[in-house]
Amino acid sequence: MLSSIERQFVRTERPLYGHLVTLLENAIARGELPSGSRVPPERTLAQRLRISRTTVVSAYRELEARGLLRGYVGRGTFVCAAPEPEGTPFAWRGKIAAAALRSSDSTLRDIVRHSSDARLLSLAAGEPAIDKFPNEAFHEAVSHVLRTEPLAAWGHGPTEGQPALREAIADRYGVPRESVLILSGAQQGLDLLARCLVDPGDAVVMDRPGYLGAIQSFRAAGAKLVGWDILRADIDELEDLLVRYRPKLIYTNPTFQNPTGSTLPIRARREVLTLAQRYRVPIVEDATYGDLYFTDPPPPSLRELDDHNLVIYLNSFSKVMAPGLRLGWIAAAPSIVDQIAIIKQRMDPHTPNLVQLAIARLIRQGAFDAHLRTIRLEHAKRCAQMVSAIQRYVPRGSLRIGRPSGGLYLWCRLAPGMSANALLDRALASGVAFVAGTAFYPDPAGDSDLRLCFTSVLPSQMDESIRKLGACIADARLSQTA
């Protein structure tokens, strides 16, 4: 059976897990996988098909939901095409809605899990140098709020956010207060925007490669994802995509981009805005890394250059202070803010008030900008330290790396013939994690790429992390020539 699946599997199909579901479902229907037979372990099938284990897990989960497979802890996964006998334990997966199964990719959850696993050195998590968090200033801010506004801190709050924080953001970033909506993290903002703006079948033009959380949110809304090569930033290509697909929106992360670390030049920013105005397409600008420059500030944001109210601006305190804050914000036309607030209140009536009020005080007192100055210097040092470690510990010619001027990430390309997903399996077994490039593409691509976060480990752990990664790369190259 496995050889039959291998022959029929086409790696250019999208989504890959859906293609695999179809092949396995057909094999069950034809009797090639009879009821009661065991399907290959997830890792084995992933290796044979040269795809990520996540893809196989997603396919198996969907087949479980359809009642065709059944997993047993410690025994494996089995075909159960025939009706299950009376007394069989109830299977909840068969009750999951089809729409939920569209978003079965667990890569984001895996990244967070790896970052909290004490056995792993995680170069995967997208987080700032949280050991530099301004603990004393934050403690003072929280104490002040609890002393002076305890009812506001612990009671219900407006869905749009605490007025104090909306005003502080409006003053610092130069936007009207009524245009600001507070979020429980920028990822919530992407989910809300997808729910608010995207109907099933709508096209969304986005960075390629681009933020995997955006890929997941727009795909879950039923969007057709169309990639624009953010590294080439060819404006003619973008115009062709706008003409051909008539997208509902453009999503871009133009400053210290996730995952590449690249920054869109000022001329390209103006040209993107011109095209958006010409074709009447709104832009979602993900600006979560814009404050994280090393030395020189980046070009003005699309929002700052926008003269036509086309840009929805998304930002976050989680990426510049700590992910545990779960605090982000949107700035947009008040009509969009009102609609998003209506959607937000159904799932999250308000973002925690205490954190909002504390951050508002940090901004007003100047502690927020002082923290930014500290981590800009720290991030520049850690980026240089990682580059130096790669030069020392990774075999020459095995890894080509970008050189960002801000943000959190190094975007790397493996030598020809090497697989980032296969390397990730080796790395996890050796105690180090990263993100394979396939997670950042809306189409089958990126298996030669990987993203490393240079701020997610302490400086004292950097050399060990890269040494382990370098050893895995060396082993993988030896396997190529064996």
Question: Language model features by range: what are they?
Answer:
Residues 1-143, 341, 345-352, 360-363, ...:
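N-terminal basic, amphipathic alpha-helical segments
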Residues 440-444:
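AMP-binding (ANL) adenylation modules
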